[in-house]
């Protein structure tokens, strides 16, 4: 009987936590909302909504933000998350710089620091990250306790479980620990993820929310892909899925940063420089549709994407990175036409080619989403 009583109390506590998480998610996606809005959108009873909202207001997690339209009676009180209740640190270590942003729990970027780091090494990378974090926390008067977590997006093969870069050709780092050394200085959770996976996640949270199976392509300042499969990041058994830039296109082609020959990244770089953002934008703008360079660039890209589609059977291809800032509608239609030409009959039906919804800070926004949804607000465990 005692055991059953403990189990019952535990189940009630867990259900309360799950319902609270559901309400927070609803505010985060659709706020501000009234209590009646929440009852309708969550399916929870008015009594449950009132009880939980009262507790969240008491904890300063929810705040009153105004009044809604009346349908014939008292105007409903509109509520929303208190953005200052918690903060998220989210960053991107690219081949050119380290960018770390401070965001509130409404995903507003309140500050961002970017520092150029041309040659990251075992010796200078961790101190550089530590310095930026300390600077952004200090200048915004945020305590460590207010930070829900840090997410860093990094090019390469990442071990999320132990916070280690298994291998990054772009950064020339192997078996390099990020979480362990940073945890000596900061008490909040520290996570790392492949940068293009985070960019793909940003589309799920902030852009093409209705899509559940798609490939996100980052084109410049690197070439990579993130795969969203059934609404989740698909990493593969060993975290190596999505290395789009290292698809073999020419067995005796130009040498890649990974040391091999003929990867897609160096093959495409023969026509447009990929690994420097500004150089890529300038070169792409100067590229004439129909020119030999343009056709070669689009051809190789379309062939690689055709192979992807044949393997994965996705519903969309989303282009991101620097390319989305300079590509015209003609580019997307040209890629689409070439994929249709190269793909097997019926394989390309219903697959769409789309520009990314976010053209800036897509890795940072995806990282913020990951941090928030893995924070204390969403840990559906007892205690």
Short names for language-model regions:
Residues 1-145, 252-255, 260-383:
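ATP-binding/phosphotransfer module of carbohydrate and carboxylate kinases, centering on a glycine-rich
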Residues 70, 156-160, 198-200, 224-225, ...:
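Short, active-site-adjacent cap segments at secondary-structure transitions
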Residues 78, 90, 157, 189, ...:
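Short, surface-exposed charged micro-motifs
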Residues 88-92, 147-151, 214-218, 224-226:
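Short glycine-aspartate micro-motif
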Residues 104, 160, 228:
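Short, acidic, Ser/Thr-enriched surface-loop or helix-capping motifs
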Residues 112-114, 121, 174, 185-290:
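Glycine/GP-enriched mid-protein hinge/lid loop-to-helix segment characteristic of carbohydrate kinases
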Residues 113-213, 330-341:
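Glycine-rich phosphate-binding loop and adjoining helix at the ATP-binding site
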């Amino acid at each position: 009987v005692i055991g059953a009583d403990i189990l019952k109390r535990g189940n009630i506590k867990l259900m309360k936590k799950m319902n609270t998480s559901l309400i927070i998610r609803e505010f985060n996606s659709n706020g501000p909302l009234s209590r009646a809005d929440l009852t309708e959108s969550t399916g929870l009873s008015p009594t449950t909504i009132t009880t939980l909202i009262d507790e969240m207001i008491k904890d300063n997690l929810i705040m009153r933000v105004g009044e809604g339209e009346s349908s014939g009676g008292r105007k409903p009180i509109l509520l929303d998350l208190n953005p200052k209740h918690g903060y998220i640190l989210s960053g991107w270590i690219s081949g050119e710089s380290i960018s770390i942003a401070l965001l509130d729990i409404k995903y507003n970027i309140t500050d961002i620091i970017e520092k150029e780091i041309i040659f990251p090494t075992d010796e200078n990378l961790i101190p550089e990250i530590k310095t930026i974090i300390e600077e952004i926390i200090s200048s915004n008067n945020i305590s460590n306790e207010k930070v829900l977590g840090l997410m860093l997006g990094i090019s390469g093969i990442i071990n999320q479980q132990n916070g280690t870069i298994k291998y990054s050709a772009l950064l020339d780092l192997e078996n390099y620990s990020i979480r362990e050394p940073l945890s000596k200085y900061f008490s909040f959770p520290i996570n790392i993820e492949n940068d293009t996976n985070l960019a793909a996640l940003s589309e799920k949270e902030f852009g093409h929310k209705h899509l559940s199976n798609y490939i996100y392509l980052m084109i410049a300042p690197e070439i990579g892909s993130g795969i969203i499969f059934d609404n989740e990041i698909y990493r593969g058994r060993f975290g190596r899925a999505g290395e789009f830039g290292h698809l073999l296109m020419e067995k005796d082609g130009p040498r890649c940063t990974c040391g091999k020959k003929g990867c897609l990244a160096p093959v495409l770089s023969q026509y447009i420089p990929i690994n420097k953002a500004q150089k890529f934008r300038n070169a792409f703008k100067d590229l004439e549709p129909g020119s030999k360079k343009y056709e070669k660039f689009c051809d190789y890209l379309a062939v690689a994407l055709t192979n992807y589609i044949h393997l994965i059977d996705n519903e969309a291809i989303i282009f991101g990175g620097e390319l989305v800032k300079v590509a015209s509608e003609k580019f997307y239609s040209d890629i689409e036409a070439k994929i249709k030409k190269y793909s097997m009959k019926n394989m390309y039906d219903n697959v769409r080619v789309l520009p990314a919804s976010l053209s800036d800070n897509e890795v940072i926004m995806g990282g913020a989403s990951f941090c928030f949804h893995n924070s204390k607000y969403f840990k559906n465990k007892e205690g």
